[in-house]
Swiss-Prot record:
Catalytic residue list: 31, 38
Family membership: Belongs to the GTP cyclohydrolase I family. QueF type 1 subfamily.
Protein name, entry field: NADPH-dependent 7-cyano-7-deazaguanine reductase
EC number: 1.7.1.13
Main location: cytoplasm
Length: 116
């Protein structure tokens, strides 16, 4: 996945704590074991510091996962790592909710918080 696709813009309110929530209800990837498609919803919540993520670039970043054979846990942590590295937010969480396969669903969540 190419994190260099991600673009930022300046936070107009860097002195204020506020939360941005982004939901992608059409995320797709490929199961590395079976080669079958996986479908999920990705929710990103963050408190920006100096920058915010530009949504069109995030959409193209997500599309990079479409044909990638990657486990749910790896996707969730990869997105967090890439966004934290780029944004340097005050806090950020990624929640991935995966549609049922064989009657089983999975939700993976990971959190980051700046240390002062």
């Amino acid at each position: 996945m190419k994190k260099d696709l991600l673009e930022l813009f300046d936070n107009s309110f860097p002195d204020r704590d506020y939360t941005i929530e982004i939901v992608n209800a059409e995320f797709t990837s490929v199961c590395p074991k079976t080669g079958l498609p996986d479908f999920g919803t990705i929710t990103i919540r963050y408190v920006p510091d100096k920058s915010c993520i530009e949504l069109k670039s995030l959409k193209y970043y997500f599309l990079e996962f479409r044909n990638a054979g990657i486990f749910y846990e790896n996707i969730t942590n990869r997105i967090l790592d890439d966004l934290v590295t780029l944004l340097q937010p005050r806090s950020l969480s990624v929640i991935t909710e995966w549609r049922a396969r064989g009657g089983i669903t999975e939700t993976v969540s990971v959190n980051y918080s700046q240390t002062l």
